[in-house]
Regions:
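Glycoside hydrolase catalytic-domain context in secreted enzymes
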Residues: 1-388, 409-844, 853-917
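Short beta-strand elements
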Residues: 389-414
Length: 917
């Protein structure tokens, strides 16, 4: 196997291991788990038959070669026997209650209709040894959860299922195939013997869960979120989901920082909690090593009878003084190797004090906008979850300023934020008045004198024959503006079906041998809407629950190699936003309520991706903590909460990954849309953190001038803020699509700013695989390995291609199409922006009782299902409507039953549409 060959067996093994290590066991009475050899197992729940491998949206649209669900893996296990009669009852019911795929993007059901459990089913399973109840939930991009049955809460049918099965079986295990945590009050009410969070484990998820259920892997996952009694117990809930403004009044008291400080009695399962099939003891000590570091030494011993892994968690408690602090802050963790019964492992962690420093945004310590260590006693706690961690040591600390920074992204007006008063009582105080407006500190770099084309090519910079500045001096003003614009989605200039192309997209830029760079959606795998297969990874929450950075790094090393083989330069992930509230639909894509864990896991993913030369784009920078009205809803946050909570994970990933690419959000923070925030994109990223990569917008992002609404044409403020690449346009050469040229001519956007951004982009290009292809410096070994990869993928070069006429219409003949059940028709469509009506003319010789569905996908997103019936040989036409953006799209027609003859399909443009559709 060559150096660049993708070892799919190793890839699958790593994903399977991660899926297993991310499972979190919350309860295990009566030794219900692991399953015993010879057990007869009753599987309940219709979601056993449809596994959620991922959440919804851009992060979930990976075409996979296979998906192993929990039921699939159980059925393949030879050590147990499934109750086939019960399975038959479910399969018969599901035929009459098929899976509901919803109506497309943002309109997919959070859950599926559950089969009511009957006395017949219970009687059928009465002789079985153990019952597994499998429940599922999904949510995702543009689709938050709601505090309703079928979403955050169980439905009555699901409650009835758990109640009846738990009453009949002393060994009942409920398995949750979910992306986010859900309401868990039912555990106490119905008392199932075991409860396991299995999350969404990608294409190997079922195998990983089965390994845990069978005891091949001892559960060792830990919760990355606090599970509280009720959704109303989370302090963010009262300020979540507003369509205009969300006040982060809980401030730094997010997740366990709030509950351990103010509301211990509201916690059902604490942060960091997770059971094992064995038991462990922890002996630890902590002391100050020097003025910068605390040293923790611990011995973890397996005191049980089964081999297993344990997670060591370290928390700091700062002194309470003029600056209030939470009673616990995670500042270190480590996962043991697999320890045999009686075996122990000695762990030493050297923890920088800046991991638990506090930020003073008001000057109450005398040092405004500084990270500080407070005067007093710092106490270190060590254990296996935040609640049971024991004191390991303490030390006296003198007041110390660790880092002088400056105010960024401050609220326009003060608002009341939560504080901790003496006696751990909740108080409120106003955020400080801001000093700087969003444009007060915008720097205008000196311009490089333009020389025109001197014959230099980007390869000359790569070979160090000339400086980057000499190269950029050749670029015209139009070149610099066009370099700012990415194209997509599904640009034909890069790997088919991917999210975007950027850099060398126009003839004038290509003249300088600037390659087109490729970006693909992630972070759950490579999304290629043309049908090319890729590996579907476990979701972000599951990976966080492993607490195993080395395992995650190894897994993403495989993904990095997969990116390189597919000529993708950056994966749009990992997602590093904070689980501020359990109802955020995109929590599955993010990691935790804790910024330290988030940053460490994000850095591990980047370290793996970077090895093969491609990289990741960390997102969404910053504070993308709800999907409802994410383009408009203003996140109003104190500078302290930004610095300690919502930016900290990004900071760790930028510095330790290191990150080379960052994506901003759709919406505003404190009145300024992040795509055009100089504070975020220049001061925080580049000045404070030393970031030297590129920043890109989210797709079709908007910006604003402070105090004004956002506008999709406002791009110049993005470039001035050092957001280097606007994503995405249909044509980078179109100078009328935005305000770039106009603002440049007015002097509001300078040549020096554009040249600075160009240098950022081109420095990224120089480190990318695309540059090696451009210079023809790819090794024969890599070319061979790439040629041998993925032979079963569709040949995009032979795909039908159609271009809209002047009116925007496309007509495709269906003559000769194979429309047997399960067959697909793929086509590459070059469409205009607007509202389309798709008309499909078919006939069937079957009678009118025949059901002949055809599902229509555009760029892997379902647009609708045409529900034909038998027409006794008569031609019939049905239609669906949808909006789309200008550019290339990949259409797929999926035939759900045999019996149709297609005359043609036609796409008719009927009106303009918003680009965000």
């Amino acid at each position: 196997m060559g150096r660049y060959a993708l070892d799919m067996e190793k890839y699958a093994d790593l994903a399977r291991t991660a899926s297993a290590e991310g499972c979190v066991l919350l309860k295990n009475d009566n030794s219900t788990l692991p399953l015993k050899k010879g057990d007869k197992v009753a599987v309940f729940g219709r979601m056993a038959f449809h596994y959620y491998k991922s959440g919804l949206g851009s992060g979930g649209l990976v075409n996979t070669r296979y998906v192993v669900g929990i039921f699939d893996a159980l059925r393949a296990c030879k050590d147990i026997a499934l109750d086939e009669e019960l399975i038959g009852i479910y399969e018969k019911w599901i035929k009459d209650h098929p899976y509901d795929e919803g109506e497309g993007w943002g309109l997919v059901p959070w859950s599926q209709e559950e089969m009511p459990v009957t006395e017949e089913m219970l009687q059928t399973a009465s002789g079985d040894d153990v019952a597994l109840v499998i429940l599922g939930r999904t949510a995702g991009e543009d689709q938050d959860n709601t505090d309703k049955p079928g979403s955050y809460k169980l439905t009555r049918t699901e409650e009835d299922l758990i109640r009846k099965v738990s009453s009949q079986f002393s060994r009942t295990a409920v398995i949750l195939n979910v992306g986010n945590i859900i309401d868990m009050k039912w555990v106490r009410e119905f008392d199932p013997a075991a409860v396991l969070y299995a999350w969404q484990g990608g294409q190997e998820g079922g195998n990983g869960v089965c390994d845990v259920l069978m005891g091949r892997v001892n559960p060792c996952g830990k919760l990355t979120d606090t599970i509280a009694e009720d959704i109303s117990d989370y302090p963010s809930t009262s300020n979540f989901g507003d369509l205009q403004k969300n006040y982060y009044k809980e401030d730094i008291y997010v997740g366990y920082r709030y509950f351990e400080t103010f509301a211990k009695d509201k916690v059902l399962y604490p942060f960091g909690f997770g059971l094992s099939y064995t038991s462990f003891s922890v002996q630890a000590s902590a002391e100050e090593k020097d003025e910068h570091t605390v040293c923790v030494k611990a011995t973890v011993k397996n005191t049980g009878t089964k081999p297993g892994k344990e997670v060591l968690e370290v928390y700091a408690k700062a002194p309470q003084g003029v600056l209030d602090t939470p009673v616990r802050v995670l500042c270190g963790f480590a996962k043991t190797k697999e320890l045999a019964a009686g075996e122990e492992e000695h762990i030493t962690l050297e923890i920088p004090k800046n991991t638990f420093a506090s930020y003073d945004d008001s000057g109450v310590t005398g040092h405004r906008d500084c990270f500080v260590l407070l005067e007093g006693t710092y106490t270190i706690y060590v254990g296996t979850d935040v609640r049971t961690a024991q004191k390991a040591g303490s030390y006296p600390q003198t007041f110390t300023v660790l880092e002088q920074l400056e105010e960024v992204c401050a609220p326009q007006k003060p608002f009341a934020r939560m504080t901790r008063k003496l006696g751990d009582v909740i108080g409120y105080s106003d955020t400080p008045e801001r000093i700087y407006g969003p444009y007060d500190r915008v720097e205008k770099p000196a311009e490089i004198s333009q020389t025109g084309d001197k014959g230099y090519r980007l390869e000359d910079v790569y070979d160090k024959k000339i400086s980057m500045e000499t190269f950029v001096a050749q670029l015209s003003d139009e070149d610099l503006i066009m370099l700012f614009r990415g194209e997509g989605m599904c640009s034909p200039k890069v790997t088919p079906g991917t999210a975007a192309a950027f850099a060398g997209l126009t003839p004038s830029l290509r003249k300088f041998r600037i390659p087109a760079e490729c970006a693909s959606d992630g972070p759950s795998g490579i999304r290629m809407d043309c049908g090319t297969k890729a590996f579907s990874l476990p979701n972000g929450t599951l990976l966080g629950c492993t607490f195993n950075c080395e395992l995650v790094r190894q897994l993403y090393e495989m993904t990095g190699l997969e990116l390189r083989l597919n000529r993708v330069d950056t994966l749009l992930g990992p997602g590093l936003n904070i689980h501020r509230n359990p109802l955020n639909g995109r929590n599955f894509e993010y990691i935790s309520e804790d910024p330290f864990l988030t940053g460490k896991m994000g850095a591990a993913q980047l370290q793996g991706l970077n090895i093969a030369g491609s990289t990741g784009t960390i997102k969404h920078f910053a504070a993308n903590n709800q999907e409802t009205k994410r383009h408009e809803a203003d996140s109003i946050i104190s500078v302290r909460a930004l610095r300690e909570i919502y930016l900290k994970g990004f900071e760790i990933a930028v510095k330790e990954g290191p990150a080379r690419s960052v994506m901003t959000t759709y919406g505003p923070v404190n009145g300024v849309w992040t795509a055009g925030s100089y504070d975020l994109n220049t001061i925080v990223l580049r000045k404070d953190w030393g970031f030297s990569g590129i920043v890109m917008t989210d797709w079709w992002a908007k910006a604003n001038h402070e105090g004004q609404p956002s506008d999709p044409r406002i791009h110049a403020v993005m470039a001035a803020a050092q957001n280097d690449v606007y994503m995405v346009t249909a044509d980078a050469q179109d100078m009328q699509q935005d305000d770039m040229l106009e603002e440049f001519q007015k002097g509001n956007l300078t040549r020096g700013q554009l040249q600075r951004n160009a240098i950022n982009i081109l420095q990224f290009v120089l480190k990318s695989p695309a540059m090696l292809y451009e210079m023809d410096r790819i090794s024969p070994e890599e070319l061979k390995d790439r040629k041998n990869a993925a032979k079963d993928d569709p040949d995009v070069s032979k795909m039908m291609k159609f271009v809209a006429d002047e009116q925007g219409n496309i007509r495709i003949s269906g003559g000769g199409w194979d429309t047997h059940q399960g067959k697909e028709i793929l086509a590459d469509l070059d469409m205009k922006a607007g509202s389309y009506e798709l008309q499909m003319k078919v006939k069937s010789n079957l009678d009118d009782l025949a059901q002949l569905p055809v599902t229509v996908y555009l760029d892997n997103i379902i647009k609708g299902t045409l529900s034909f019936r038998g027409s006794k040989g008569q031609w019939v036409t049905q239609q669906i409507r949808f909006d789309t953006f200008e550019g290339h799209h990949y259409m797929k027609l999926y035939f759900g039953a045999t019996g149709l003859t297609v005359d043609h399909i036609a796409f008719q443009l009927s009106g303009g549409a918003d680009k965000e559709q």
